[in-house]
Amino acid sequence: MEFGYFTLSDNHYDDNTRSSNQFVADITAEALYAEKVGMHSAWIGEHHFNSLGVLSCPDLVLAYVAANTTRLRLAPAVNVLPLHHPIRVAEQWATLDLLSGGRVDFACGRGYDKREYLPFHVSFEDNQGIFEEGLELVRKLWQTEGRISHHGKHYRFDDVRITPKPIQRPLPTYVGSFSKPSIELAARLGCGLIVAPFAAAMSFGGLKQVADLYHETSAKHGKAPGRLMCSYFTHFADDKAQEDAARARQIRYYKECVIPAFPGDPKSAPPSYRYFIDIVDRLHKVKPEDLTENSVLLGSSARITETLKKVEAAGFAEVILYVNVGLKPHNQVKDEMARFMTEVAPAFASSRATAAA
């Protein structure tokens, strides 16, 4: 199992004195450090208007990271595809794949925050259809050598051929999923799947249930399943005081960042987001003692390793680590990244663990 760096650039906290610019600089440094300590990949989320996160252009940050690394794989987590024209998305990520020497993994999703849709004049209510049509177009634009035309419900164009083409054929593509329709889409298209354990536990019962559903659905469509990945909030704690602080940090993230961003109001949540109502209700009620291995990696190196062995057994090929969550200081984030790769990663045969220099 491989391990990567992950962030949603959460900075929306009531008493936060860390500037957006400083956090983007920290994230960039952490992504570079991921290669130094032996991580496999860096996955950077897309958020707009500081509604949850402050990093709106993961493609630009990853282009900088690409120029300053040699082997680290580079990915958005995720590209909010309905906010962008699929032609432009195909061009941007194909270009980064070329410049990085074929190191891009492309992950996309619908997002979940209506506040990010309104200024772009994109329909939040119709974004399932926009997303599906857009994803199929991006993949077609990458894979087709000649010119293509398209006349769909949401996008129409004639005689288009993008350049450059990606080095990787096919370019690895993942669907970010909180729901059964997204799993269905990933399976139907033969895409990989990336999930959040806390949401998987609430919606499906756990990661194994998600993996089973994905494999069953892939078989139904006659497709070989893609690669399974998950993100995990990560906190090292060696005593009760450290564990209590980590739990408080995680709860604060849910309360101040996630709940305001999720479509949890029964009066306004579109039909394709109704499952978020239950997730938000549970997050409102969550207590520090409710944080288990279903949602976080928290505790000693041995405890974290034990949890990840179960994730590996469920069929997941990579875990991306959300270490810099909840205003965790930059130096602590780097220390925990290095500790993970030194004390946890070596227990997994395919990891590329190296000691921090």
Roles of regions detected by a PLM:
Residues F3, A34, G38, E46, ...:
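Conserved, mostly hydrophobic/aromatic
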Residues P82-G192, G205-E216, G222:
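Internal, glycine-rich beta/alpha segment that forms the wall or movable "lid"
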Residues F3-T7, A42-I44, L74-P76, V104-C108, ...:
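Hydrophobic faces of well-ordered beta-strands that scaffold small-molecule active sites
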Residues N11-A25, N79-I87, I167-S177, H235-A237, ...:
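Active-site mouth loops of central-metabolism enzymes
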Residues Y5-T7, Q128-I162, S203-F316, A349-A357:
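An alpha-helical appendage that flanks or caps ligand/catalytic pockets
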Residues L52-P76, I130, M337-A353:
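Alpha-helix-loop-beta-strand connector modules within alpha/beta enzyme cores
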Residues S41-V65, V80, P197-F204, P266, ...:
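Glycine-rich, proline-tolerant flexible connector loops at the mouths of alpha/beta enzymes
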Residues M1-T69, R73, R169-L171, A357:
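N-terminal beta1-alpha1-beta2 module of alpha/beta enzyme domains
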